[in-house]
């Protein structure tokens, strides 16, 4: 199981670390992921809404029924039902019905409480934006509060000014929800400080 078992395992590990190290605040936990990680980060905040305070999910394959079948079969497993029957001329035919074993994230939407930021590339040809839109539709139907951005020129990877925009939105999202720091809404170039820090070493 690529979703439920790892999510429980991650939560347990974070709880153990927070109990062991006083500098870790176990009441303010955030999670981020892209692609399969985007699937997991959205699933995490929907599965454990009282544990995760914030999540950023980008380009997530939230509904594996419309994702790459080869990937899904290898990593999630597919149940196959084989039916045989005869048509009106008496010719025997075999039909195959496949179902994905993992539930789509939109089925978890009812559990979600707060703190989710979704991103998708408008021309993503790896994980179709419909994956994110299906989750969005479920969240709206459940009257849930969340934020979402569509990056117009982006495929599965974010690049250029869109990548910078995405990074800044993610930093600000986590700063607000995990640190109660609204000063992060100001434009701060963290890369500049990281480069300067490297030069001092």
Kindly label every feature range from the protein language model.
Residues 1-201:
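Active-site-proximal cap/loop segments of hydrolase catalytic domains
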């Amino acid at each position: 199981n690529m979703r439920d078992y790892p999510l429980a395992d991650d939560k347990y590990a974070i709880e153990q670390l927070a109990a062991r190290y006083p500098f870790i605040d176990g009441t303010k936990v955030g999670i981020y992921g892209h692609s399969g990680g985007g699937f997991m980060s959205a699933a995490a905040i929907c599965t454990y809404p009282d544990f995760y305070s914030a999540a950023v999910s980008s380009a997530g394959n939230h509904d594996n029924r419309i994702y790459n079948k080869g990937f899904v079969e290898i990593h999630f497993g597919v149940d196959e039902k084989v039916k045989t029957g005869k048509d009106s001329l008496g010719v025997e035919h075999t039909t195959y019905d496949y179902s994905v074993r993992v539930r789509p994230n939109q089925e978890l939407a009812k559990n979600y409480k707060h703190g989710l930021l979704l991103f998708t590339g408008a021309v993503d040809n790896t994980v179709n934006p419909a994956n994110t839109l299906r989750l969005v539709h479920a969240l709206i139907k459940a009257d849930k509060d969340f934020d979402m951005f569509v990056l117009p020129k982006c495929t599965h990877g974010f690049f250029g000014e869109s990548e910078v925009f995405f990074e800044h939105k993610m930093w600000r999202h986590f700063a607000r929800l995990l640190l109660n720091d609204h000063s992060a809404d100001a434009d701060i170039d963290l890369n500049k400080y990281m480069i300067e820090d490297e030069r001092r070493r």
